[in-house]
């Protein structure tokens, strides 16, 4: 328990003030007429300090659930935040982690072309769209 908490605060302040002033005076020339002001200033400065707060904990960078290289597999893509496997990450990132794809890439230092969809799933969607004729010019009707 500290001296401040046990009620020895006034004695401690006087002792600290005396130590500080003695150290200062031993290394500096101080006129006798200024000594009272110096003691008063040091004592009031010490009185205005609060109980020391513990230093803020250093925030460590979050480690990914899996390595970036292993996160993209043919059939699935793994979320670096939680380790879940998905065909598409975009909705999961917004609903569970409140991150846009851009924020996710920035947070994990991923390249801008890092996929948000598993490669096999993207290929299947592309193949299906081509079979449906999407992306082709429409033929004019007879008329």
UniProtKB/Swiss-Prot annotation:
A zinc finger (C2H3-type) spans 79-97. Belongs to the ros/MucR family. It comes from Rhizobium etli (strain ATCC 51251 / DSM 11541 / JCM 21823 / NBRC 15573 / CFN 42). One of its GO terms (biological process) is regulation of DNA-templated transcription. Keywords: DNA-binding, Metal-binding, Nodulation, Transcription, Transcription regulation, Zinc, Zinc-finger. InterPro entries: ROS/MUCR_sf, ROS_MUCR. Pfam families: ROS_MUCR. This is Transcriptional regulatory protein RosR. Gene3D superfamilies: ROS/MUCR transcriptional regulator protein. The lineage of its organism: Bacteria, Pseudomonadati, Pseudomonadota, Alphaproteobacteria, Hyphomicrobiales. The keyword Amino-acid biosynthesis does not apply. One of its GO terms (molecular function) is zinc ion binding.
